[in-house]
Amino acid sequence: MKKFLAACAIACLPLSAMAADAYTVLFKTHGTFQDVRDALQFAIEGKGLKINHTNNIAEMLARTGPEVGATKRVYENGEQFEFCSAVISRQMMEADPHAMVMCPYIVSVYTIPNDKNVYIAYRKPGPTRNPALKKALANVEKLLNDIVKDAM
C-alpha cells in the first residue's frame, strides 16, 4: 500500500526532474510556454533577485539560421534569464576569486517542436576541491533548484 501511495504522489507532481548530462539539471512540465516562463520570472523575482537580461535563444537561432545554412528549427520557444545573488555570489568569489566565471546564473525555459512538454534547465555547478567554494556552489545549486520548484 505504501508503494502504491508513493507512486500516486509521484504521478501527481506537476514537475519532474529528468536525467541529464553531468553539467545540466533538467526539468519538464506541462502547460503553455508563456505560463511557465512567467512563473519562472516571478520565482526569480520572488527571491528578491533582479533579472539582468533575458536572452531570446529561439528567436536568435531562427533569425541566424538562414545565414549559416541551417534549416532545422531547434526550439518553438526558448528564453534564458540571467541573474545573480549578491549574497551567494560574494560567498563564491570570496572562496575563489576565479569563480567569477560562474556568474551570472542562467535558467533556461523552452519548448521543442513536436513535444508538448515545457523544459526548464540550468547548469550544474562543477566539482571543486576547495571546501569553501564547494559550500558556496551547493548554495548556488540550492537557489537554482528552489527557483525552479517555486515556478512549478
Question: What are the roles of these predicted feature ranges?
Answer:
Residues 29-37, 54, 74, 130-133, ...:
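Solvent-exposed, acidic/flexible segments
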Residues 122-152:
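C-terminal partner/receptor-binding element of secreted or periplasmic proteins
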